[in-house]
Amino acid sequence: GWAALGNGIDVTIFFTFWGMDMINKERVDQLQIAPVGNTAMKMTMMGLNTGNLGIPNIMGVLPGMTAFATKLMKDKMEELEVPPVREYLQMLADAGAKLYACKMSVDMMGLKMEDFVDGVEAIVTAADFMDMTEGAQIIFI
């Protein structure tokens, strides 16, 4: 989002299901990285020179591994001067990015607009989001 905004490209982000934690005031500062089934978790994150070898899933189920993976990620973000998620979302919104919450996810989770961090503009349906971004390049990660 930040690179696109810096190049004059409109940025619109639609948060759904697990992404809702990123915009939820109560959860955004306690986000965790689950190592089980996470293809982004590489052994190099633990300081082991193993190339592209992933952390085995069996290790992810061990007690404390989620906390360990989360600490690794937070330490790496701090080392690279990447802002925390709450601050980054505010930077995006301040720079003109449009942030939206998925209505179906909001309804399923019993959330309301006041549950979200500053910068979230509205709760919209997926169809509304597609109408708003018609003709745009959409990236789903």
Model regions: which residues?
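Long, hydrophobic N-terminal alpha-helical segment
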Residues: 1-29
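Short coil/turn connectors at secondary-structure junctions
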Residues: 7-11, 94-97, 133-136
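Short C-terminal domain-edge/linker segments immediately following a structured domain
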Residues: 14-19, 43-47, 130-136
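Short, hinge-like loop/turn segments at secondary-structure boundaries
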Residues: 29-33, 118-120
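A glycine-rich helix N-cap at a beta->alpha junction
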Residues: 31-68, 73, 81
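Flexible, low-complexity linker and terminal segments
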Residues: 122, 127-141
